Regions:
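Acidic, turn/loop-rich segments in luminal/extracellular domains of secretory-pathway
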Residues: 1-38, 48-58, 63-136, 144-153, ...
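Type III/flagellar secretion export determinants
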Residues: 45, 141-142
Length: 193
């Protein structure tokens, strides 16, 4: 066991010297100087994985740090994607911006605790789970209006859809009069027979 200023700031020892008959003693006072030591740091994830659609403000992890000299600690985050998260003065790591699994399925952030002199770091590994999102859909008419004698098979409009999870898109039509039109697997809407 080494010296620890936080445990004892000094030691008073008695040094004895003996020749077998006579003993001489002298007091030794050993002073221990304080050295600013790095804080200790640990963190706990709130869950093993987080859905990409979790609300901003959700607590992702909680950090716990202590300083041997009882100095005030400040927390910070760094690393790719750290702009999506924030850490407060209590060590709570929260989500501050929306996540997208298709952009990043995980984040490895560096959590730091500093006493102003020394800094300790820890890694927070955050796993993101996919949520099946609705496809995006756009359409454009081939013309602003069509004559009542427009030929069967004439393209009326074109639809375009894409799915964030790259799933197969299926088109369909509904509503009053939809039986007068057909849509194929490419999104071409034509006049039906």
């Amino acid at each position: 066991a080494g010296l620890d200023y936080e445990t004892a700031t000094s030691y008073t020892l008695t040094l004895n010297a003996s020749d077998g008959v006579n003993t001489t003693s002298s007091d030794l006072i050993i002073t221990v100087e304080d050295v600013n030591e790095a804080p200790s740091l640990s963190n706990t994830l709130a869950a093993s994985s987080f859905a990409e659609n979790i609300a901003t403000g959700t607590t992702i992890a909680t950090a716990s740090a202590s300083d041997p000299e009882s100095q005030t600690l400040t927390y910070s985050l760094s690393g790719t994607g750290s702009e999506y998260f924030a850490v407060d003065s209590s060590g709570n790591v929260t989500l501050v911006a929306g996540l997208d699994y298709e952009t990043a399925s995980s984040y490895n952030l560096t959590l730091s605790a500093s006493d102003g002199v020394n800094t300790t770091t820890n890694t927070i590994a955050i796993s993101i789970s996919d949520v099946n999102e609705a496809p995006s859909l756009s359409s454009s008419l081939a013309a602003s209006s069509f004559a009542e004698n427009t030929a069967t098979g004439t393209t009326i409009a074109t639809a375009s859809a894409s799915d964030p999870e790259s799933q197969t898109i299926t088109y369909s039509l509904s509503g009053a009069g939809s039986e007068n039109f057909a849509v194929d697997s490419s999104g071409n809407i034509t006049l039906a027979s």
